[in-house]
Amino acid sequence: MAKSSYEKPDFWTQKAKKEGYPARSIYKLEEINEKFRLLKKNMHILDIGAAPGSWSLWVLRKFKSFHDQSMLVSVDLSDLTIPKDKPNFHFIQGDIFSDVVQKQLITYGPFDLILSDAAPATTGNSTVDTSRSEELVRCVLDLSAEHLKTGGALVCKFFIGGGQQELLSQAKSTFKTVRTYKPEACRTSSFETYLIAQQKL
């Protein structure tokens, strides 16, 4: 019998619940990190579109094994569902692209690694959704150029559409190495993938 297309998402959802994560998306980040070895000791990390908090919680759990000066700053319009009482964790509730939040980022940055699992509100119209996603990624790339350290890295979700090559070209103007990668934890039917940009120029 053929496997249901939702069998894999059910597996990841149950695994996330068992391990105490708010959402299954954590396994996308975990796989990306295993493949590209992005997380290292003594990093300042920015998590964009952090709610409900799975990626932030995963990073904080990694920090516990480092015993160093690592720091995480997470930003989202919505509140997080994870504990925020960590000395090396700062949550900013607001618009990442607003002047107010940008000034706060300058205080905490520059960053070694920027993570973005952010996505626009979807409409069900693939043309509209991919266009909105591409615009969001362009803004994240601009932000990365401003707030990433030289040599830093970016992980950013985007929806595959007609503007993919333009996004890659923009990334290549700022980073030495640019790839796309779709983790196993992504739904097979999903048109989301991740931009992996390393070694900021």
Language-model segment annotations:
Residues K41-A51:
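Conserved class I S-adenosyl-L-methionine
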Residues I160-L201:
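Class I S-adenosyl-L-methionine
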Residues M1-K41:
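Class I SAM-dependent methyltransferase Rossmann-like catalytic core
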Residues M43, S70, G152:
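Glycine-centered, small-residue-biased loops immediately flanking beta-strands
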Residues D68-D76:
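Conserved SAM-binding motif I beta-strand of class I
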Residues P52-F66:
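Conserved SAM-binding loop of SAM-dependent methyltransferases across substrates and taxa
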Residues L77-A121:
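S-adenosyl-L-methionine
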Residues I96, Y108-G151, G162-Q165:
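Mobile active-site "lid"/loop adjacent to the S-adenosyl-L-methionine
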